[in-house]
Amino acid sequence: MIEQDLIKVRIIGGNDSPESSKYLEDIRTTLNGIDNNTNMINIIGLDACKNIHPNSFELDGYHGGVRALDCRILN
């Protein structure tokens, strides 16, 4: 588990490999970088509305990636 201030990230399942640790660190870094001036992190589902919300981001467990979604490409 990674904990920083109010952000806690825990992986369930899988193994304690360097890849898993990197994946968790990427998630923590991404969440820590989100600033919407409310002191709160909004995790917005990709299917929350017809158009993808501009503050959405994707956690890709299969490929181990964390990325912001570029709505200009997806819309």
From Swiss-Prot:
It comes from the Bacteria. This is Uncharacterized protein RC0132.
